Amino acid sequence: ANQFLGSKNVKDLAFLTELQDFIEKRHAEMPEGSYTTKLFKGGAAKMCKKVGEETIEAIVEAMNGTNDQFIYECSDMIYHLIVLLTSKGIRIEDLARELKARHKG
């Protein structure tokens, strides 16, 4: 495993990759009635707006809500961010590599 994470945490984090794989499949197939399809069809403006809205909701919960509410809103924010990343051909692993490169410890 990783020096920072136990094996359960690594499996939990691996779900972000699985989620992006699913979102990429939605992007390729664009099934009718899918919320993810609706986001892709709305273009960058719609996706960016949703990332912004969900980020604000997460901030509000961080300031005034419970940890469970904060986690819920952060999950929405991450989902919408992954949709936006996918639309730009960027993988969540690209963000992990960037963060790892910045880590000096």
What spans do the regions from the language model cover?
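Flexible "arm" and connector segments at domain edges
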Residues: A1-C74, I78-G105
